[in-house]
């Protein structure tokens, strides 16, 4: 695709608006959807709206962060610090994000009970299955195993660099959860735990004991399968979790 400053310079079949009308919004990439919001690119760097949108997502994902998580909590000041994003583009992006939040909040609330590895895998499938990069996520639960929040903590290449107990339990405490399930994916599809997976689980079980917040399981998701470390290992016998 030619990243010139004007959408008009892109072939009609590749323009985001035209593609949305032709094939539907759900088939557009994240960059294409943002490009529709901001309308124009950055002429100083010869970027089309799509090119600038890709740059915004790349900037938000620095440090192995989830770009959507960053956008959900971003401010006008943070957005305008990105080259090519002025107040108008920042306002357009933030308006789109806020509208999405309000639509989501208007949905009838459905309580999701996560009381088995299978239920946890279903809750995590959209975030972790069929991903090209390794992702680490946490399910925040209440005392009755009702799902409070699903958070992708980090995105990276190796389990040992993906997650730190501090980051994981910060999410749990922030959401007022009383128990958690952690999970990450193996892009290869092999759901057998690596030595690093076992070491990380051991550290997190120890942290959970200290904090009094039980870690219920650690799942590894593949392409269309998953494995439960609680079922496969004796770690939970070695580090009994608080009730």
Swiss-Prot record:
CDD domains: MPN_DUF2466
InterPro entries linked: MPN, RadC_JAB, UPF0758, UPF0758_CS, UPF0758_N
Annotated Zn(2+) binding sites: 184, 186, 197
Pfam family, any one: UPF0758_N
MF GO annotations: metal ion binding; metallopeptidase activity
Entries under SUPFAM superfamilies matching the protein: JAB1/MPN domain
Record-annotated MPN domain positions: 112-235
Entry keyword set: Hydrolase, Metal-binding, Metalloprotease, Protease, Zinc
UniProt short sequence motif JAMM motif, positions renumbered to this chain: 184-197
GO BP field: proteolysis
Family: Belongs to the UPF0758 family.
Protein name per its UniProtKB record: UPF0758 protein SYNPCC7002_A0220
Species for this entry: Picosynechococcus sp. (strain ATCC 27264 / PCC 7002 / PR-6)
């Amino acid at each position: 695709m030619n990243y010139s400053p004007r959408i008009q310079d892109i072939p009609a079949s590749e323009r985001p608006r035209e593609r949305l009308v032709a094939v539907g919004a759900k088939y557009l990439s994240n960059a294409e959807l943002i490009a529709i919001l901001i309308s124009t690119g950055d002429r100083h760097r010869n970027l089309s709206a799509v090119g600038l949108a890709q740059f915004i997502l790349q900037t938000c994902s620095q440090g192995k962060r989830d770009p959507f998580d960053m956008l959900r909590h971003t401010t006008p000041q943070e957005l305008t610090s990105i080259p090519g994003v002025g107040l108008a583009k920042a306002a357009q992006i933030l308006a789109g994000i806020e509208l999405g939040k309000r639509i989501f909040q208007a949905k009838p609330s459905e309580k999701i009970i996560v009381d088995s590895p299978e239920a946890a895998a279903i809750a995590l499938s959209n975030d972790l299955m069929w991903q090209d990069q390794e992702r680490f996520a946490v399910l925040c639960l209440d005392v009755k195993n009702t799902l409070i929040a699903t958070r992708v903590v980090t995105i990276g290449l190796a389990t040992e660099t993906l997650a730190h107990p501090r980051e994981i339990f910060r999410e749990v405490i922030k959401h007022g959860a009383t128990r958690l399930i952690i999970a990450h994916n193996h892009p290869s599809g092999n759901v057998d735990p690596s030595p690093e997976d076992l070491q990380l689980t051991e550290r997190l079980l120890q942290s959970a004991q200290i904090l009094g917040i039980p870690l219920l399981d650690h799942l590894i998701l593949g392409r269309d399968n998953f494995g439960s470390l609680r079922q496969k290992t004796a770690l939970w016998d070695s580090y009994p979790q608080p009730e």
